[in-house]
Amino acid sequence: MSKKRTIALTISAIAVALGIGAQFYTNHKIDQVLKNFPYTLDNQATLNVTQTAKNFFMRELIFSVKDSDAKSTNVISTKLTALPFFITAESQLSDQLVRQLNKTLNITIDKNTINSKFSPVGDYLQSDILTEFRDFANKSQNLSIGLHFLKNKEVELKTTLSGFNYDKDTKLEEIDGEARLVPVGANQYDLSSIDLTAKNAEVALLNGENTHVYMKNATYHFDVKPGEADKRDLSTKFSSDILRVANKSRTTEESQATAGGLNLLVKQNGVPSSINFHHEFKKLSDGSLSIKDGVNLLTKIFTQNDRFDSSLSVLSVNVPKNNQPYFNLQNAGLELKLANTDLTKANVDFKLNVESVKQTPADEERKWEAKGGKVNIQLDDYNVANELAFVPFLLDTIAEKEAPAKDNKDFLNAKDKWVKEFSGKTNIEAALKSFNMADLVLDDVSASDKTETLDNDQYNEHITLSANKASYPSAGFQFEKLAIDAPFKINHSKAHLSARFCS
């Protein structure tokens, strides 16, 4: 045997040995990964895997998901091909999942391909999912999803959807989305962030009877950051260039309320990890959310946290009547901040600013316009818990068709508790640059009301009112440089509060 042939055979033998060794290593890594299952996803679902076939180069797997109701669904069947230091996978959606998706989403899946690559050395995974389907309107749509398992163990998903007609009331066009899952423990992932954009969206809430919403160039962002002691910090942003609201009496675009340049920001710090709004929002989307459920949901969003910060701004709002301009709002914004660590001594800060607002009914005498409106409300060390205690009674009153025959003892006890524990400071300020309605004219009007509870059953109240001009000729009065300053000290404040409550 020649020397060159001997060297070549030796090199080949080394290569085969290394390849076999790498193959053993690759299979070892696959076994390690499979042992990590099941995985928990955001406390809402469990991902499991079953190995149905195996040899030195190939594995066949079935992935299944079990939801919070313990219902299990096979989602993907995968054929792994293990090469030295490299793995490829060909996958397809299970027949069970395809049938479920077709039924749930009103679609027909025509084609679906899933291609994956995985390196056991670098712990890198990339999957591309391409789906062609026909929606409710029998329109062909394309969905692409890219999944990346990053080196820091985080999971990144990117998706593009050409469009989707779910039913006659819900339609989406050109949707792009990104989501990120982060590891929070052994075999457990939580949602970290979501970003969605839509060129056009038409959504029906509460069955669309009174809340049919159209959006153009809408964006949605949500992220979660871990806080202290099993708490999380949540942030939600929403914007839409145009938002139109329709109902059964406003069916044409010309008759619908329209908001332009809408921006919403909500931050909730210190939300207990045990709280999950998923089920409540699910009720909202399918129309089963009652008024009571809705109020309870809002109460949770506002108060079940250590701090709540929110802002809402809009460039314009137009509400027509009989297809004619009727109500117009320009450049309005509000802010609400709540310090909720102790709801018996909460701090509330509310601000509202409006550049201009006007109403133009057919009757000239009823037309009015206001400019430069401002409202500031501050509550310090205020017992919000006692205020919230009346919400269930209010909801019951709304539901009752007849007045109760006798007083509700629980309500009276709540009232007595409210009077006894009433405390804190309040500061309410309002200002208006101008107001015009027929011959009523107001110019530079401002008012304030400040209160503070004191010891010995007393509290202070200070009321002010000023106006540069107030003119109403048809009523026979006109004021200029009006100023009222009225400080009070109230004795027997508990009795006064009780009487004021009943009034």
Located regions from the model:
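Hydrophobic membrane-insertion alpha-helices, especially the h-region
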Residues: I7-Q23
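Bacterial Sec-dependent N-terminal signal peptides
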Residues: M1-T6
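Glycine-rich, small/hydroxylated-residue low-complexity segments
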Residues: F24-N27, D31-S503
